[in-house]
């Protein structure tokens, strides 16, 4: 029997794939558990239209991500942190601080998608990588300044 997988099944394949399985496995396990549906003409057509819509949606999201990437590349962020007279920070600048600075500029990126190569413990100019889509990573340029120097 041919079925369309609704979820990823380790032994069979990924969601959306059409696979051939034994009748008993499909009728007694996959279909009742909601892991698959029967592959009929109607469901196959529905699957194709859903895949086309999904592809269009992903392309639109990728286009918006590229636009965001260009905006972020040109941006110059300022991150404020407590610092001593010598320019050494009390603590470190984290990805959460960079995410907050981006949010203040109107760009919302999850802090877990921002990576800093080395701990930032002094004032100065730095770069971080931000993954804004599946395959689009952008360099975020920012400057760490002492908290009292805000204008």
UniProtKB/Swiss-Prot annotation:
It holds the Pfam family Ribosomal_L9_C. Keywords: Ribonucleoprotein, Ribosomal protein, RNA-binding, rRNA-binding. One of its GO terms (cellular component) is ribonucleoprotein complex. The keyword Ribosomal protein applies. One of its GO terms (biological process) is translation. GO terms for molecular function: rRNA binding; structural constituent of ribosome. InterPro entries: Ribosomal_bL9, Ribosomal_bL9/RNase_H1_N, Ribosomal_bL9_bac/chp, Ribosomal_bL9_C, Ribosomal_bL9_C_sf, Ribosomal_bL9_N, Ribosomal_bL9_N_sf. NCBIfam families: L9 (TIGR00158). Binds to the 23S rRNA. Belongs to the bacterial ribosomal protein bL9 family. This is Large ribosomal subunit protein bL9.
